[in-house]
Structures are given as C-alpha cells and as structure tokens.
C-alpha cells in the first residue's frame, strides 16, 4: 500500500516527500498536475532520461542549470545543437555530463520537431496515451504500466532515445497523465478536479 507522511504544516503528502525538504514544493506545485504545454512536456521527458540510474533529487537540484545549458528545453533551438555544443556541455559541471544522455536530448529535440509536424503538438501525441481508468493501479505501487510500455515502444519506433517504460511511467506520473498521488494525500482530490476540467489537446 502506498503511504503518506504528515508535514510540519499538518498536511498529508505522498511519503516520498520525506526523502528531501525540497520535494515538498515540487510535490505541492508541480508533480501530477496535468501539463499540456509542449516545452514543459519536452523538458520533463529529457530530465527523466537524465535521471536514469540517478535520483530525482540530483536532477531537481540541477534543473535550472539544465535549462540554461539546453536552451530552456526549446526543442526547436536544441535540435540545432551540434558536436561543438555536445563538447561544451560535457565540460559543464552544472549538469549531468553523460554523452549518451546529452546526445539523446538533442536527438529527441529533432524527433520532437518531426512529431509537431505530424501530430500538431507534443501534447496532442502524449495525451493520446492517457490510460483508461480501469488500467490504473493502486497509487505508487507500480513503476511501469501497459500504457507506459506502449508509449515507450512507440517513441522508440519514432527514433526517440532514453525513453524506456520506467522513464516514461515517471513522466506520465509527473505530467498528470495519471493521478498517482497516494490515497490520503491532500492533493489527490485536487488533482482529480483539475483533470476533470482539463480540455485534452488533440
């Protein structure tokens, strides 16, 4: 069963908030709120790729550095990065200096541009993979789902990299394609209401 923790303000939150003090603000203002902005969706899927094998705390601490280094995750600008940019980024101590992940982000920016041409927007594409409610497991008991596997497979077929099913599931949790706030978390009902009123892109 997923659990909650009670913060100093008396509010019950998802238990993972207890792992680091900075997680509370991220949890309360970002995680699980539905996102239909292409740039934010692209940023998140890139950062989830960088997180692979690391902790989200590490990535969150470096997020502003990533934004500065990667053209604020404007995928149209990032798609134009070349080998000189890769070498520059490999010298940037403010980010995760992993050549494969850096090159994957640039590659994915190019794929994102192609996707917008075909689909109209990244949001229209990603929200097509919003799971049916019957598929949703008990909150925070899974690290993948049939939909995250399907989305991962489709992204890879389109040439995206560092988009395995676990990475994609974390992306879906964070971007509000599912409401994975724990039962008892003070935000779970609020997220449900936001999701009900959301006009899905497409």
Place the predicted regions along the sequence by residue.
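HhH-family (HhH-GPD) DNA N-glycosylase catalytic core used in base-excision repair
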Residues: 1-202
